[in-house]
Design a protein with these regions (language model features):
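Elongated alpha-helical scaffolds
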Residues: 1-2, 131, 412, 521
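SAM-dependent methyltransferase catalytic region
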Residues: 209, 213, 227-500
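A generic structural motif
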Residues: 2-4, 28-35, 364-373, 498-505
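Preference for the N-terminal adenyl/adenosyl cofactor-binding alpha/beta module
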Residues: 34-303, 337, 341-347, 354, ...
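Extended amphipathic alpha-helical scaffold segments
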Residues: 123, 141, 486, 515-516
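Charged, often glycine-rich, active-site loop that binds/positions anionic groups
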Residues: 159, 165, 387-390, 513-517
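Nucleic acid-processing catalytic cores of prokaryotic defense/repair systems
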Residues: 1-49, 302, 308
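Class I S-adenosyl-L-methionine
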Residues: 497-521
Length: 521
């Protein structure tokens, strides 16, 4: 696509927009690009504000003329621009389809098996992120994407859902009136952009740390994507980055508690078993119910790896033997104890990518049968039977998530739940929240916020376990809000509490001892 201004005999220059047609680019993609350019390249109200209109005009193109994407930041922005096009297209197709149309069927399948209250807008968002990050995941293998037909094979085996998703889409595609047309989603343009990107340099960037080790580049990539793609969604879902220092405190506190309070010398690395309902389970089963991009699970892997290496060294194991022992440990004693739930598609995909990279950095070699136990699911929804008509690639993911919710005796629940107004209201979570609401007569209450639902989910999950630890970064209002008094009372009845106040609460305008604004977490 290209644009230029044509001088007029009278008045302002005229904006001329043209396209370079390619067989692989459908008319819908061309029209979307024209609309985007027309809105961004409008003549400025203030011609003298040169920096302002230059900045606005530069947004018209995800990359410059003949520019190849070499950085994660530029790639995130380009990926977001395609995701926006896909997200806009899905409701258009939905509105003209019959109930038997592919988009209608997919929507109903996701509602039945994954997220019960999934509206068409949120569904479009999920599919857009799935496609964008699915293709990105395929490209991270280092190989170019040869085409839609072989896309599923290109996605890392650690993310079986994405592999099955694209296999399922391929089976639904075709030229018939009720088939799925990949041209409608600008996939060929997205594939071309990803293939031309310097993926090696970008992955090397992922292996480093920004700002003197203070910022994770994978998180930076995701936050750049989300800010370009949908800022409001980030606020609604309470998606915010947890500083690594805070993550490390949470994970290490759980580790130390297992050692000191539960007499497990290896802490989070312990894989001894006990009998639960007649079956042997590891005592330390770990869940992050709001996984996001996998930061807490990544820190857990780091700590467990360090613990086991030190343990083997203390036993006199030769350095040359430790790598084999670690690979065996991951296969048999780590992956089966590490779980995550995530409801948003982009962070779900990044979590798989990030955890896979972390394990590879420790020297672990994935075999083709291994997948990570991070599942796409709404933590706050009760598991329900899955209809027989739901496509297999969706039903498998949902079945695995339901199995984890219902059958696995989790003893450790950690993470940073979303801070947002109530997004999930169903009979199951409403019933579960009742102990937090007893004898509350306030007309206004924040007790239905998402973070308190996640806290209730977590405490309920571990309450029957021989070992039970919940370690969350939680809203500061927990300490003093009157409407949370029953919540605090319930926790005091059931748990031994340890509270680390990270300070820096802007809502109450905390000050330092010197009287300055507290800039802590």
């Amino acid at each position: 696509y290209f644009a230029h201004f044509k001088e007029q005999e009278k008045g302002l220059p005229k904006l001329m927009i043209g396209t370079k047609w390619q067989d692989s680019q459908p008319e819908t993609e061309i029209m979307a690009a024209k609309l985007k350019l027309k809105s961004i390249l409008a003549w400025p109200d203030n011609e003298n504000d040169i920096p302002s209109w230059k900045k606005k005009w530069s947004k018209a193109f995800s990359v410059g003329h003949k520019e190849v994407i070499k950085t994660s930041s530029r790639l995130a922005k380009a990926l977001a621009s395609y995701a926006v096009l896909i997200k806009q297209k899905i409701p258009e197709i939905y509105s003209i389809e019959t109930d038997d149309g592919v988009i209608h069927k997919l929507h109903e399948s996701f509602k039945d098996a994954l997220i019960k209250d999934l509206g068409i807008s949120d569904f479009a968002d999920m599919i857009a992120q799935t496609i964008a990050y699915g293709l990105f995941s395929a490209r991270t293998t280092g190989k170019e994407i040869s085409g839609i037909e072989t896309l599923a094979e290109s996605i890392p085996s650690t993310n079986q859902f994405l592999r099955d998703f694209f296999s399922g889409l391929e089976s639904l595609s075709g030229d018939g009136p009720s088939d799925l047309d990949f041209d409608d989603f600008s996939l060929y343009g997205l594939i071309e952009m990803l293939n031309e990107a310097k993926i090696g340099a970008i992955l090397e960037e992922f292996g480093t740390q920004f700002n003197g080790g203070k910022q994770d580049p994978v998180i930076h990539f995701y936050e750049t994507f989300l800010s370009e793609y949908d800022k409001q969604r980030r606020v609604e879902r309470g998606v915010f980055y947890t500083p690594k220092s805070v993550v490390d405190v949470i994970v290490s506190s759980v580790h130390q508690s297992l050692i000191q309070d539960f007499n497990l010398p290896l802490g989070l690395a312990d894989h001894s078993t006990h009998i639960v309902d007649g079956k042997a389970w590891p005592k330390v089963m770990i869940l992050d119910p709001s996984t996001g991009t996998g930061t807490f699970l990544e820190a857990t892997i780091e700590l467990i790896h360090k613990t086991m290496v030190n343990h083997w060294k203390s036993e006199g194991v030769k350095k040359s033997e430790i790598l084999d022992l670690w690979n065996n440990y991951v296969d048999n004693h780590l992956l089966n104890r590490l779980y995550g739930f995530e409801v948003m598609m982009a962070p779900y995909s990044i979590a798989h990518l990030k955890l896979g990279m972390k394990l590879q950095q420790t020297g672990y070699k994935f075999n083709s049968n291994i997948r990570l136990n991070v599942y796409l699911t709404n933590t706050l929804e009760k598991p329900a039977p899955i209809s027989n008509w739901v496509p297999e690639f969706i039903s498998i993911e949902s079945s695995k998530a339901n199995e984890a919710k219902e059958q696995i005796p989790f003893s450790i629940v950690l993470g940073n739940p979303p801070y947002s107004k109530s997004m999930t209201m169903n009979q199951w979570i409403t019933e579960l929240m009742k102990p937090y609401k007893q004898n509350l007569d306030e007309k206004k209450s924040d007790i239905n916020r998402e973070e308190w639902k996640f806290l209730r989910f977590a405490t309920n999950l571990v309450s029957e376990s021989e070992i039970g630890i919940v370690s969350f970064v939680i809203n500061n209002s927990f300490l003093s809000a009157p409407t949370l008094r029953r919540l605090r009372s319930k926790l005091l009845d059931d748990f031994s509490l340890q509270i680390y106040n990270l300070h820096g609460d802007s809502n109450i305008k905390e000050k330092t001892d010197e009287g300055k604004p507290d800039a802590n977490v």
